């Protein structure tokens, strides 16, 4: 493929092809920026990295407003007595997280990994106990709605949008139409932002690879292999089984669509919250029920944490093996599940699951000092770990939503 053809893909053709072109160009720029720096006097990758910063900033800026109006409009316009699929979707979210943790525990014991602990990282913002995490979650729910939108507190935004949406179900049709128009207007803005995804990916890839490179990951190859291998197993074995249970047909076309169109973008933005607009656009193209996906996808970004369950479990067990501690399989599973479920308090933040490592480690009696160093390990491998984790988390949001919607269609057609 010549250069002109590669550049043309950034401006026309399918979004997936354009993102792929941006990925290739980003890698090329990252590789040539260092040799060119002496000649041109600046690091080219750092300069184009601003494109990625702008793209992620735009997604994060629009996401709270999109959630607020979309969820509120969907609930306000829902007819009283209408059947909801949310219970089935939430069950899938929780079951998927549980099975991800289960697979991670198995992988952690089958492939025991020891690491050379890095220098201390600041973990002062990490929760110290389950009670503290739950308290933070409750405080986020009752946050001021304007403050929640300004600070992108997605738990608070979701709580207020659900509350107002339910309260406005008895409002006049004119009021409901205004809410729908606002939701549609924000959705159009989202569509414009997503069309710039290839440029965002180009900037993100160029800057990230130029800054850290793949050499930094060399000392943690086994840990990365276990982490990413477990996530891939969950994405392409565990999740398809759950989807088949719902739709009763070959799940892989749907799985691949969600991974390709949601997971790829989430891999580079490294934020489930920033990927919410992408998932909503995909749900529209899949012709899913808007009243369902407008609520389930933002909710999934906060509670569907399969990738976080894997990260917390694998890294905690790595600390256990490094220290030579003896922990029973059942204890490891139960304690890791508790930590993974509490991870919803750190959702929507790139690398947020790493802050839950001290919580999981404390359940095994591991000191805060060691736990803080494990956070440092997480940051070192974060270039791949956090990206893969977010891709799994976010693509699963739309995957499970689609599975439940398709199950409903199958039952109605029967």
UniProtKB/Swiss-Prot annotation:
GO MF: neutral L-amino acid:sodium symporter activity
Transmembrane segment boundaries: 22-42, 54-74, 89-109, 148-168, 189-209, 223-243, 305-325, 337-357
Source organism of the structure: Haemophilus influenzae (strain PittGG)
InterPro entries reported for this sequence: Na-dicarboxylate_symporter (IPR001991), Na:dicarbo_symporter_sf (IPR036458), Ser_Thr_transp_SstT (IPR023025)
Keyword Transmembrane carried by entry: yes
GO biological process, one term: serine transport
Function description: Involved in the import of serine and threonine into the cell, with the concomitant import of sodium (symport system).
HAMAP family cross-referenced by the UniProt entry: Ser_Thr_transp_SstT
Catalytic activity: L-serine(in) + Na(+)(in) = L-serine(out) + Na(+)(out); L-threonine(in) + Na(+)(in) = L-threonine(out) + Na(+)(out)
Family label: Belongs to the dicarboxylate/amino acid:cation symporter (DAACS) (TC 2.A.23) family.
NCBIfam families the UniProt entry points to: PRK13628.1
Membrane topology: Multi-pass membrane protein
Entry GO terms, CC: plasma membrane
Matches recorded under PANTHER family: PROTON/GLUTAMATE-ASPARTATE SYMPORTER, SERINE_THREONINE TRANSPORTER SSTT
Broad class of where this protein is predominantly found: membrane
Protein's name according to its UniProt entry: Serine/threonine transporter SstT
Recorded superkingdom: Bacteria
Entry keyword annotation includes Iron-sulfur: no
Record keywords, A-Z: Amino-acid transport, Cell inner membrane, Cell membrane, Membrane, Symport, Transmembrane, Transmembrane helix, Transport
Location(s), subcellular: Cell inner membrane
